[in-house]
Amino acid sequence: MSEPSFRSVVEMFQHRVASTPDAEAMSGKRDGQWHAMTWRQTERRVRAGAGGLLSLGLQKGERAAILATSRPEWVIADLGILAAGGATSTIYTSNTAEESAYILVNSDARVCFVENAMQDAKLREVRDQLGHVVQLILIDGEPAVDDGWTISLTELERRGDAWNTANPGRLDEVIAAVGPTDLATLIYTSGTTGKPKGVMLTHDNWLFEAETIADLGILGPTDKQLLFLPLAHSFGKVLEVAFIRLGVITAIDGNIDDLVANLAVVRPTIMAGVPRVYEKVYNRVVTGAREGGGLKYRIFQWALDVGGRVSRLRQTGGQPAGLLAFQHRLADKLVYSKLKARLGGRLRFLVSGGAPLSRAIAEFFHACDVLILEAYGLTESSAGSVGNRPERYKFGTVGIPYKGVETRIAEDGEILLRGRGIMRGYYNLPEDTAEALEADGWFHTGDIGHLDADGFLSITDRKKDILVTAGGKNIAPQNIEGQLKAACPYVSQVVMLGDRRPFCVALITLNEETAGKWAREHGIEYKDYADLATRPALQHLIRDGIEAVNATLASYEKIKDFHLLDHDLSQETGELTPKMSVKRKVVEANHKEILERFYGETVARI
């Protein structure tokens, strides 16, 4: 592994500060403007926050939670907790009061950082359940209620500076006492069923991830990333430890609605996202080209054809020459450059994780001269375990295992992982831990996949999501759902169902932006999303997409019928997890009446 090695995430952070104290560390938005801070400035606030937590009586190993969107203060709070010898529990701002209380109680959190007055008020709704939480720390503004339970982050840091002055050298002793096997993070997997489980991740887990990314040799201090993923999730957290380890300048804003505007200002060289983000970009570009019609659309199709030929050449290690090179330069000027400009104009590559990326979408971006590297991991493996590299990639796969990660395919096709990134276990759940984690270190991912002759891993589906038809045929729905989303840019979500049933159907939601634009341009008036979903012309448009995908499938895999839902799936309806994964069982239960119309009494018997 890369040198130097560290005993804790905080020690790694201290090394970064000592190496490049006055270099830009990260930036965030305040009043609509970006404000940057150096590593030295970041350290001052981390030490103040850590001192403040120690003044509150936080003991080694105790949990402090963060209930906030991704922003520089999230990183400062996290590092402050770790420097005080504690461990961070993460909560999404989209969690309800009851869900937040569950995590705070289950993780035994003593302190909770809250983003704003709204999150403060949310926890006050369930204060009677939170007797063990001694302090809320408000990141934005001053407390609305002057009862001492909530103090501002500014006040915490003021107290911390005073505590550090009164106890010289004590904070450094606390930091030095933190070791690699100590708990660093409790991340609660929302899952698609049941209560969330606290995944215990140690300092060594995160150090392994940081070292692994450093070993790839693809990032450095000249890079700039735009981090919009939730830092409450392992994918976001691994980006945090990577930018600390490598000195990558990081602009942080968790507001996904500002992503396009932020790209234009930040102009990142690298960015990581979930497939949903890339699907939305794809939908906008493709529908815009189609609606341009005539010559514009023909030029777009020609450019994609040229880009596709160059992509296939590059995938085998070649480069365009002669006429193809000239055509590619022209296509870049006419088409690709516009997409790249939307993404800031400086991207070297994108990273995709958290859910399967449609091969068609990866190939589309590459045809437009934008490389998306798909990677794979789980919260239980500290996120990054397998990935494609800029110099070695295959679309439709998640790449090859990172150094220090072992992979094995079980007899039933389940992917097993082993290595330093694997969790310690589930917090206070020994039986669940024993079920997922073998005594010799192999972790059962719950994903089905296979390794090809070159060692590239392909994910077929979640083990629990595999559909087994009434005729005994196995179907991997995520692959088919991804094909449909790529074939029909007017679709937002596809939920394919058919387990133990005679045929497959799909519950589909519209991409209101692209579908609404198409409707208006075709003279179709509608009141709202629900009204739009009832329009026959839209139904025919979606059916055409389904028929195009069905033409590539075996008979038992085909979608025989579909229904356009009157709403998009969301966390608010309980149909999506915070990382935007579909909760199939919830969707199925919420729309049982629709399924009964498809299957008659079949549903009632299941």
Enumerate the language-model features and the residues they cover.
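Structural core segment of the AMP-binding/adenylate-forming
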Residues: S55-L56, A83-R158, E173, L541
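Conserved AMP-binding/adenylate-forming core of the ANL superfamily
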Residues: S2-S5, A25-L79, T96-A101, S152-G160, ...
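Conserved AMP-binding A3 loop
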Residues: A36-R40, A176, A184-A210
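Conserved ATP-binding/catalytic segment of the ANL
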Residues: P401-T469
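Conserved pre-ATP/AMP-binding loop-to-beta segment of ANL
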Residues: P21-E24, T150, E157, D161-Y188, ...
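Gly/Ser/Thr-rich phosphate-binding loop
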Residues: I151-L153, T269-A272, R284-Y393, E406, ...
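Conserved AMP-binding/adenylation subdomain of ANL enzymes
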Residues: L207-K224, L231-Y336
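Conserved structural elements of the adenylate-forming
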Residues: E43-A48, P180, V199-G220, S337
